[in-house]
Amino acid sequence: MFRDKVVVITGGAGGIGKCIAEEFRKEGAAVCVIDCAEGDHYVGDIGDKTTLEAFAGQVIKTYGRVDVLVNNAPPMMKGINDCTWEDFTHALNVGVTAAFYLTKLFLPVLAQGASIINISSSRDRMSQPQTESYTAAKGGIAALTHALAVSLAGKARVNSISPGWIDTDYTVYHGPDATQQPAGRVGNPLDIANMVLFLCSDRAGFITGENICIDGGMTRQMIYHADHGWTLNE
């Protein structure tokens, strides 16, 4: 399905991004990854404008086109108490501005029928304390998605995915953290990667501008103290 397609993934060296990259490679795609972690990919900070320009230039020089762009790299998570101006600005640069700018840089070489996937978060609609930088960035990329979908109508389809709690190399959930999910378990990177590949396929040709929440039903679960076994421990 994706044989010889050119796929660009930010934050593709670990976690969800790594799984997405692996699944596209299994389908025969040429996958271009940028990540701040060291490895056999383009190493750089996507919060930096010149880095994005250099990376995009390399992809365009090598392949001449882009079929799929997955804006996956996560911003830092800091709250109102500790987050500085610089921290917050960098989080928005990584989480929102980079997605906008890479789309702009690749616009002249987007293949007909191209697909752009933005990885948001269930935090684009709900919050925990002290998560302002991350939550603002995820809310921003969710809104950017439908704006781009309209602007790029006829050129590319643009959708976003909002994962809930996902077991990755960095975080593994156990016990009540897992069983509280209506789906009965925590998500895994393949849950997200499968949706990415579906949305980028011809089977999703009538889907654009959408945000799909993959969170095991957590954001649909009404939680109040003393209701259906839920308890608040102050």
Residue ranges and their predicted role:
Residues 72-77, 217:
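Conserved NAD(P)H cofactor-binding loop of Rossmann-fold oxidoreductase domains
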Residues 103, 137, 145:
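Active-site helix of classical SDR
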Residues 79-92, 177:
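Substrate-binding pocket helix/loop in short-chain dehydrogenase/reductase
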Residues 208-234:
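Short C-terminal tail/terminal secondary-structure segment
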Residues 2-31:
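Canonical Rossmann dinucleotide-binding motif of NAD(H)/NADP(H)-dependent dehydrogenases/reductases
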Residues 160-161, 175-207, 214-216:
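C-terminal helical subdomain
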